[in-house]
Amino acid sequence: MIVCAEMDEHWGYVGAKSRQRWLFYAYDRIRRTVVAHVFGERTLATLERLLSLLSAFEVVVWMTDGWPLYESRLKGKLHVISKRYTQRIERHNLNLRQHLARLGRKSLSFSKSVELHDKVIGHYLNIKHYQ
């Protein structure tokens, strides 16, 4: 059971900034760890994939930013929309940018293939959160 889960999306790119790649993930506010993540476009389909991974957990309270798809998809659940209550996951986004140069906004380091981009970030999350 997860008492409080923060959900957010993190922007990245592959090859050129026009080829966007989004990391959607959920962060357990109490345990301070990433619970699940998926890569894809910033669409409802990617959000649905993340929520299907999270269906195994019983999440009591969802905390998200103001992206409208969160509100429409989490209707009927205890859902808090606030920047104040997503500060931990936003801090984690900053940590990702600091630890992985390819996620920096203005960097000479960038991913050249989608497969490698997903594997490097997935491996980092696996080492830091899933083990």
UniProtKB/Swiss-Prot annotation:
**Role summary:** Absolutely required for transposition of IS1.
PANTHER family membership: INSERTION ELEMENT IS1 1 PROTEIN INSB-RELATED
Q: What is this protein called?
A: Insertion element IS1 protein InsB
Pfam families this protein is in?
Answer: DDE_Tnp_IS1
**GO molecular function list:** DNA binding; transposase activity
Which InterPro entries does the UniProt record give? Answer: Transposase_27, Transposase_27_IS1
Among the GO biological process terms of this entry, one is: DNA transposition
Similarity-based family: Belongs to the transposase 27 family.
UniProt keyword list: DNA recombination, Transposable element, Transposition
Look up and give the organism this protein is from: Shigella flexneri
Lineage top rank: taxon:
Bacteria
